[in-house]
């Protein structure tokens, strides 16, 4: 039996992974795609945003990150899909794993090589990293996770290039190529990337990954944890992407920056659209730089459909989504991910916007 091609879709918070995946799920490409996706936070919003009648299999694992704390769940999810496929219970051609925006893709990729059952059924096709052209420069400077995602990519897709000028795009491309000269770069504005830029790339080269991280195949527990650290280096540095034995900081895996946290707002009451717009506008003015990612499904007064709400830093938008299901209670569910955000200010303000 042929191995099932698998793609890891990664990128920092708000880069546009779900938008891209949604387009892939809607595109008439004749493929059946099993999706494994998860988000950082208590609530999973993406299963509300992703197309719900597309026929693809979506497995939610939102009790931790695929990259580490639910590694076992990822293995079980892949093996369970393979068993159900072999038994004829489900049908799919390939797998896409959408990681949380704070994930290091290295341990996710490692899963395909350290578990015999996974290796017997799946082939890791490529790691595709979506990069937000509007915010990437700041993210690459502030967050090591963003550098790791670029460093491990087999293909880089630039999103939101319409929000910056050509000079900024060129500068970002140059920086990305310094971090990862192996990965070709394409664009994916509004998720509009050709399917050929995402699937069947045959881009994953184990030897390249071992050059970047000689400990890539070392199983957790053999020596601390994973050692995958992609970093930028200046011209005076004698190596590309992996620290030598004399580097000055430790290699123990940090789950995520301790000052980054997620919180959830839920209510079955509808929002007053005008009050909510004013409050959210004031939030992004004051806390925008700290608001790494926020999204949700909203119940709005006078609107009989879901309203899908998303934002990154000061850039915020919403769209009218599908109708509420027959047996579904209309309710708002919002997730905010940020650095040192005052949860009580957000929650109190949102409550005051309810009808």
Predicted features along the sequence, with ranges:
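Phosphate/Mg2+-binding loops and adjacent switch elements
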Residues: 83-197, 202
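Short, hinge-like loop/turn segments at secondary-structure boundaries
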Residues: 51-54, 146, 202-205
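A secondary-structure boundary/capping signal
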Residues: 9, 36, 132, 159-160, ...
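C-terminal accessory "lid"/substrate-recognition subdomains
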Residues: 155, 164-325, 329, 339-355
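Helical mechanochemical/support elements of P-loop NTPase systems and associated helical scaffolds
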Residues: 5, 9, 29, 41, ...
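Nucleotide-state-sensitive switch-loop elements of NTP-binding domains
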Residues: 2-139
